[in-house]
């Protein structure tokens, strides 16, 4: 299983736009092979900071969706409302030790 964490810093006054686009993107992700679930969290200390967490059956499933034209197009729409590029962290379960 894979957990993907995407951190975004939203420009002032653009939260409504970003939430609408992220909802649209989540609906599309739900129809992708290997997508398990997703959630969006807002920082308590900084409401302009969002963290999207999604779970996937495999890294291959996630990377296929991440690199798809459909997702790239929607992500480009989201980026216009961000202070900086989204930050991605990808984690895999049950692989210790990963390196020797």
Predicted regions and their residues:
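Short, well-ordered beta-strand segments in beta-rich or mixed alpha/beta enzyme
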Residues: 2-9, 39-66
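Residue-level signal for secondary-structure boundary sites
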Residues: 14-16, 60-62, 98
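An amphipathic, aromatic/His-enriched active-site/gating alpha helix that lines ligand/cofactor pockets
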Residues: 27-37, 55-89
